[in-house]
Amino acid sequence: MEEQLIPIQWKDDALVLLDQTLLPNEVVYESFNTAEGVWDAIQVMKVRGAPAIGVSAAYGVYLGVKEFVESTEAEFIDEVKRVCAYLATSRPTAVNLFWALERMESVATDHTHLSITQLKDRLLEEAKEIHREDEEINRQIGEHALTLFHDGMGVLTHCNAGALATTKYGTATAPMYLAKEKGWDLKIYSDETRPRLQGSTLTALELQRAGIDVTVITDNMAAMVMSQGKIDAVIVGCDRVAANGDVANKIGTLGVSILAKYYNIPFYVAAPTPTIDLKTPTGKEIPIEERDASEVINRFGQYSAPKESKVYNPAFDVTPHENVTAIITEKGIVKAPFTENLKKLFQ
């Protein structure tokens, strides 16, 4: 087993991120000391995955105000709000980003009695707490998910909802790591996940390094492997779950869910409760990020289509709740009716 890749670290008063745009060919860690640097790292996907984005943004708030010139507490709180609003513009779909920023802003607005120095310390403590919580949440998701798995089963996953998308274990991959600890032999199939190939460059990489049996397939092979009986379950992560159970996840997830439904294969969504957005009624209201055309037609520095081609490049799609067998959270497994049962998680 190779050395573990650590996507997020806090060292020497700086945020240290594994540059995931360079994987699997290079392992490079980069330090960030400003909110602007963190914003850019999120936007260009040096760090990606909803939980990891949230943790990084929380540290970004602290970095954005740690050098704030001493003035009044009210001016400092305004600066915290400004930095939070700025970081919120980095990527629009992952609700963990906004959840983490709201927590950081609340630290400032709920502790107006503290001095500026004390508020800075409190902001850093909150960012570290968000970081710690994520690891425990992921393990709990894995433990619940493992009750749906058995030794020897074939599991398909899409994109990367692994340890590289979180702080440890991942969400969709958490049961895979825990199964490995139990001595189980799961056979994982990882869609390469066009256009950025997170399934092949990230999921396959981290599972292989952990000694987990993983096979890479192209996105258009999913139907074939399902028809051959190789897949017993599908498990994916998510960037946002609407109140009715609709799920926004990496582009291509919708198609996988349709195939799973056709072949009567359980389709599971691993979702930390911070990704559940009860304020958004359905998937239709979830904003879908569109990214640059170059990701589709110039992925490897050479055009795979005419340079002038029109390109549509949504980064996410929405899987309707009807296609979802269960949503697996750190608090337990949620099944339909989702509108009613998701609410119970927060009561």
Swiss-Prot record:
Binding-site positions, substrate: 48-50, 91, 198, 249-250
Residue numbers annotated as active site: 239 (proton donor)
Catalytic reaction(s) noted: 5-deoxy-alpha-D-ribose 1-phosphate = 5-deoxy-D-ribulose 1-phosphate
Taxon lineage: Bacteria, Bacillati, Bacillota, Bacilli, Bacillales
Single GO biological process annotation from the record: pentose catabolic process
Entry EC no(s): 5.3.1.-
Descriptive protein name: 5-deoxyribose 1-phosphate isomerase
Keywords noted in UniProt: Carbohydrate metabolism, Isomerase
